[in-house]
């Protein structure tokens, strides 16, 4: 009985230590994060160092751009969305190559964006001009489709 009690105590101590280490790692990962939030979803934490997820736009910043009637192209995505995971490596490098400043809006972290920007599913790319939506594309597509979509918004400015 004494051995069982000692063994049980060791197991409890190991789980407590594991919980502490995991909690500490998550706190360190979100420290000084670009989302300016105290807690982030683990899927977002995984993307913090990914070069495809660096050109973020926060809700206040997007709202300010739209209120100021600026032109902005936004990629609404969720880190847990399988279609976004296939789309991001296509659209982010393509936009950069085409000279489009594609802003990324994380709907997992900022859930109000679903209703506010009328997003029905992810991924969704929306182009705004003078603070108003003028063009949108939803879902996963091949690179050629996104290239044509980006070209169409470029031609609006020529």
For the regions a language model picked out, list residue spans one by one:
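N-terminal targeting signals for export/organelle localization
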Residues: 1-49
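Non-catalytic, surface beta->alpha helical segment in thiol-disulfide oxidoreductase systems
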Residues: 4, 126-158
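A short beta-strand-turn-helix
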Residues: 51-70
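Short active-site neighborhood of thiol/selenol oxidoreductases, capturing the structured segment around
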Residues: 65-79, 91
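Thiol-based oxidoreductase modules, predominantly thioredoxin-like and allied folds used
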Residues: 76-78, 95, 99-112, 121
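C-type cytochrome heme c attachment motif
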Residues: 79-86, 124
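Typically the conserved alpha-helix immediately C-terminal to a functionally engaged Cys/Sec
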Residues: 83-98
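Structural micro-motif
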Residues: 117-126
């Amino acid at each position: 009985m004494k051995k069982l009690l000692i063994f049980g105590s060791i197991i409890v101590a190991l789980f407590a230590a594991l919980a502490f280490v995991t909690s500490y790692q998550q706190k360190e990962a979100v420290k000084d994060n670009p989302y300016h939030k105290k807690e982030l979803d683990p899927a977002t934490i995984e993307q913090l160092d990914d070069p495809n997820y660096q050109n973020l736009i926060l809700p206040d910043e997007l709202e300010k751009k739209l209120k100021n009637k600026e032109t902005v192209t936004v990629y609404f995505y969720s880190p847990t969305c399988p279609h976004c995971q296939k789309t991001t490596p296509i659209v982010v490098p393509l936009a950069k190559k085409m000279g489009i400043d594609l802003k990324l809006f994380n709907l997992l972290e900022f859930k109000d964006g679903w209703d506010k920007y009328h997003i029905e599913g992810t991924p969704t790319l929306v182009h705004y001009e003078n603070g108003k939506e003028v063009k949108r594309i939803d879902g996963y597509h091949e690179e050629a489709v996104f290239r044509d979509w980006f070209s169409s918004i470029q031609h609006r400015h020529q």
